[in-house]
């Protein structure tokens, strides 16, 4: 057995172990049809990304699952990769070029792409290297990139297939337009920021009448594109105006007054201006009423030639001028100060403009149906289940997906326009000529695809699709997807309908959803708040294992969690506790044969039974994806039952070389520690590997050792009950000593009084534990109080009373006060149980065993209360 260092130094251990794992290729997986497959595809981080706490949680959860399944004998594959992040990367490259005094247009498309690829090569792998610091055990031989050759082939294949089936089309719709970046952006890239603004209340005169319609808008500049005014059809105030026309001020243009149920009668005046080219809801109203669409802005956010004297002005400058004119001409009623959520581009922070644009779209109605069915048929499951409702809500209300982006970095749309006949040819490769008229005068679409288009293919493109690879046959559908609730729509849904459409199967069996990590005040981490925490700094100061343990034990599936430094300190302390306990075991260890069970003591059987139960409970929790609960159970077992109780219990046997049960104690210490380390390994891979390799030096690594499973031969329930009773007694003695301020050095005579023969037997044969753990000078077990002075303090445990004659050490007034508190506590418990059993609803619905448990509690608490009352009466005499 190798000697273990005195202290655990993560900075030394982690790099050495990770290098060993990489050299030995423990993470690498080949198709093995003799084993059950288990596959996870990593949520690919952006190549522009730096590791943040969200990445750390997301990938820790995946690593836990993959390490567990690997140890459990599965053919476990974790596919890593990175996303090309079209707009983020393009912005980074543009910024770098700007520092050199260059623009995209200066170098042209090819020159820009050369620079983008060079940037990717230099910076794209940083975050993957950072994930190694976290201990991630991905198959690094299989790293994928959403623009690598295989993924690009999958993208082209998918686009062409969908186009041929009529699911991809080109049309005019409202999209999110960023005037700063001059591209369409997805809803996922729009962040809503609370800003001070105004409601401008404006009168629109009715043609042929003195009446006016009063309405309010936050964007007066868009009124130049108004093509109607709408009211609710059931609004009696305006029914007489439906079908008439009104005048749009400033333009003095006549537009119809239409009736549409979109209008909220209760909001404002119940009248809204309709600008189909600049509002998604107005666009839908425009479709229903066949209204013209007038776009009033250029791509850079300036007003276009359709806006008369405002042409060329920035939209915000035009707003001021329009409001000024409205005021001068008497149409402006009032300006109301408000705070409202403004959609901004999350990358450049510019306010986005809803604008009508000719773009490429995916028709979603038919594609959504299989994605709905696979969930309804329970072939696809969400953990927690409530997120399935969100999934269904999105699918039932899905709109066509805008997939074109006005960017150069990304998958270029494989559509070729004929300058002679106008036909569009869609092909995986440049066709060279128009498929309709044969003209060679064709040009490829300048736009690229939304980043999510390639991400939607990730579960199968990473396994080799569109080719029928062995990996695709063996590992698809993948086992579980781990992701945050924030991208259920933007990523999860798109992967599901893509998998169903292209492969005919769901992309994964389960979706494990986690929440966000917030600071200790519940706020999101952000640069503006200055509350960000760098995981790499945490790893440098604490090690990866404490960070992983803190993240996972603080996490309940689907819920946000808060980051507390105190919890991180506790996790580091746990590492030290586990290290010191292991070192203690190794210092006392001797090689020997496995002892026969007859040589095992009650304490040995108790801890074996406990670790056996632990293996079963951890397996159950992991199978339900309750990773935090599983980790907490192992943590509690190691800290409390193994370190604080069992090790202390066996010390007298270890220190006595003549003790006939010493070998059994050593064997048990080692066996339980090995099993505990294995159970903790998925959560804390580095320290468990280091300790395991010192204890079990005949094995190469804990990673491929056998996962602990429940063994019937380690089931000692009677011994569990026995030692648990002793623990309860010792704990109560310690509590009394602490309450009475009895110094640890003072030895106390402990009396155990019980009429129960079985209880007396347990305590009679456990005296050494009281001497070791409760600082007892002597332990006397008897049937009654004979010989025990009336001034002794006591504690009631089940079927026994523990007495300690502390007359010279104890303030009896305090003892009476303590017993009064205990009495109140027990009275509350009795009252609670009695009321519960008197509740007819509970009795009618609860299972029989639950009712029996409550009745047993009632009996137990009443007996304990009677003993406390008796003791109080004696002390008050």
PLM regions: where:
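Short, polar/flexible loop-turn hinges at active-site or ligand-entry regions and domain interfaces
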Residues: 99-114, 381-382, 536, 557-569, ...
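Structured ligand/cofactor/substrate-binding pocket environments in proteins
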Residues: 54-66, 73, 82-83, 151-154, ...
